[in-house]
Structure formats: structure tokens, C-alpha cells
Amino acid sequence: MLLTPTELERLTLYTAAELSRKRRSKGLRLNFPEASALIADEILEGAREGRSVAELIGFGSTILNTDDVMPGVADLLPVLQVEGTFPDGTKLVTVHQPIRPGQLPLAVMPTPGEILAPDGDIHLNGDRPTATLRAINTGDRPVQIGSHYHFFEVNKALDFPRERAFGMHLDIPAGTAVRFEPGELREVQLVQFGGTGDIHGFSGLTNGNLHDPACKLAALERARAQFFKGA
């Protein structure tokens, strides 16, 4: 038996659809691949029987409803498209909202990707020590500082009391930044790093634990030796 790639795909779809019918007959709710395969197979069979495209577009939304599928499947399948062979040629059948509401209330079904958050506001780093200080960019180029950069080790042209910033980063949402234009003075809010307190990299001033007094003294000495303003 010689089969074209399209015919092989049709057999694969039929196999998936038969599995869907078997599971549906057991009372199981269908997942996304099962629901898609079943609807597509019914449409292709309708085309083989000689039904029109317009008829199959309407028929495609009557095969399954939300009672037949797992929660969220209907939201994942807003449109179903399948190419079928009709008596007058190959045509694309597009069914919008192929899975219509069933008898069960939709309110009990969660939306895919929905965030179920507790009541109240979210407080960033609410349980960590903070500090507020003023910093000025004494350089001739802009300085941009990311949310989790060790503020003690930022650009040496930024002038502020660096000792107060040891072990701290900007108290802003992760992934955001604060930009200092040349000569700009800004007040910033800092918050202490969490976790174990080990700080490595950045400008190479710390490379130790922020809770270690000896590490802090050594970092200050390196900052002064390398002419970091405010150290």
C-alpha cells in the first residue's frame, strides 16, 4: 500500500480521534490533542461523505462542549482549521469557537495561565533592612544600575556614602533599573541582599559574605585604593 504524506497524516489523525472516542465513552474529559483530533476527524469524514464547507463549519461547533473537555481546553482552542478533500477539490474548513459552553457552570473552571493571588498588596523585600541615600553622578557619561547590582560597587564616578550601601541593592522590581545622567543627583532606596549573603563579582570589591565585618573592611579598603567616590 503506497500512501502519500497527507494520507499518512490522515491515518494518524484517525487513530488519535478513535482514542478520543474511546476515552469519551468511558466518561473521561478530553485534553487539547484529543479534542482537536476528534473534531478534525469528524469534519474530514463529513467532507468524505460529500457535505459542504458551510455545513461542516456549523457542524464543527456541535461535536464537543465544555462538559466534554478538561478545564481550559476551550480557551486553548479558539479556532480549529482542517483541510479536507471535497468532491470539487481541497478546501480549508475554519471553525471558530469549536467547543461551546455546556451545562456545567464555567465559573468553576479556571482560566489557563490565571494567577490566583491572595488578598492584599504585595510588598517587595518587606522583611529586610533598608537604607535611603542620595547619590550624584560626577562623571561625563550616564550610569545605569540594575535592580540587583551591589550598589556599593557601582560606577566609581557615582558619589554617595558607599559604606552605607554595603550589602545592598536597589529596592525596585527585579529586571528594572535606575539611570543617572551626568551631574544628576537622585535619592535612592536600597534593601539588603537576601539568601546567604555571599557576594561575588560586580567590581571585584567584595567577593565574600556581607555579614562578615572583615569582608566589609577589606571591601572599603579596595574601594578607596581604586578611587571609588564616597568610599
From Swiss-Prot:
Query: Domain of life, per the record?
Result: Bacteria
Q: Which GO terms describe its biological process?
A: urea catabolic process
**GO cellular-component term (any):** urease complex
User: What does the record give as the reaction this protein catalyses?
Assistant: urea + 2 H2O + H(+) = hydrogencarbonate + 2 NH4(+)
Pathway-wise, it operates in: Nitrogen metabolism; urea degradation; CO(2) and NH(3) from urea (urease route): step 1/1
> Where are its TM segments located?
none
Q: Where is this region: Urease gamma?
A: 1-101
Recite the UniProt keywords alphabetically.
Answer: Cytoplasm, Hydrolase
* Ranges where the record places region Urease beta: 102-231
Q: Which Pfam families match?
A: Urease_beta, Urease_gamma
- What Enzyme Commission number(s) does the record list for this chain? 3.5.1.5
Q: Localized where? A: Cytoplasm
One annotated GO molecular function is:
urease activity
EC top class, as a word? hydrolase
Family of this protein: In the N-terminal section; belongs to the urease gamma subunit family.
Q: Please give the subunit comment from the record.
A: Heterohexamer of 3 UreC (alpha) and 3 UreAB (gamma/beta) subunits.
The protein's name in its UniProt record:
Urease subunit gamma/beta
By which gene is this protein encoded?
ureAB
